[in-house]
A protein has these predicted regions:
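Mid-sequence, gly/pro-rich, charge-dense loop/helix-turn segments that line enzyme active sites
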Residues: 1-60
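Generic structural signal for well-ordered, non-membrane alpha-helical segments
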Residues: 1-5, 33, 49, 66, ...
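A structural motif corresponding to the C-terminal end of an alpha-helix
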Residues: 12-13, 31, 76-82, 121
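His/Asp/Glu-rich mid-to-C-terminal helical/loop segments that flank catalytic regions of hydrolases
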Residues: 94-129
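A C-terminal functional module that forms or caps the active site or interfaces directly
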Residues: 43-102
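Predominant activation on well-ordered alpha-helical scaffold segments within soluble catalytic domains
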Residues: 6, 71-74, 78, 115-119
């Protein structure tokens, strides 16, 4: 499931201007968004400083991002033998330079990527009779 989802995501990311507009690309400094496949770690709080980010990188150097919801879903899927893949739109680098308007990022960037990704993923599934 991960490989197929990554391929769909790569297609969705090809033209950020078409998806979110030049204004959104400029506002959030988006440059050549791409898919990263690897380890997501789960936590119970936002990582918002360079010191916190560096400490996590020392402890878990293979981690690509920190998220707060997916681990519980992944555990249930594992327990029941259901395939699972998590997809995240990364809003910042988890450091002191993180932009402050997360709600705007969700509205302008993440929601549009999510809608396009889910739509493309569903369009590629076989029809149910």
């Amino acid at each position: 499931i991960g490989h197929a989802l990554a391929a769909v995501a790569a297609d969705v990311l090809r033209d950020p201007v078409a998806l979110i507009g030049q204004e959104g690309v400029d506002e959030f400094g988006l440059q050549a968004p791409k898919v990263h496949r690897g380890l997501l770690i789960s936590g119970d709080r936002f990582v918002s400083t360079t010191a916190e980010s560096a400490a996590l990188q020392r402890e878990l150097p293979d981690a690509l991002a920190v998220e707060m919801e997916g681990a519980s879903v992944a555990q249930v899927c594992h327990d029941y033998g259901v395939p699972f893949a998590a997809m995240r739109t990364i809003s910042d680098r988890a450091d002191d330079a993180a932009h402050g308007d997360f709600a705007r990022f969700v509205a302008v960037v993440a929601s549009r990527y999510s809608l396009a990704l889910v739509g493309a993923w569903l369009a590629g599934l076989p029809a149910i009779n």
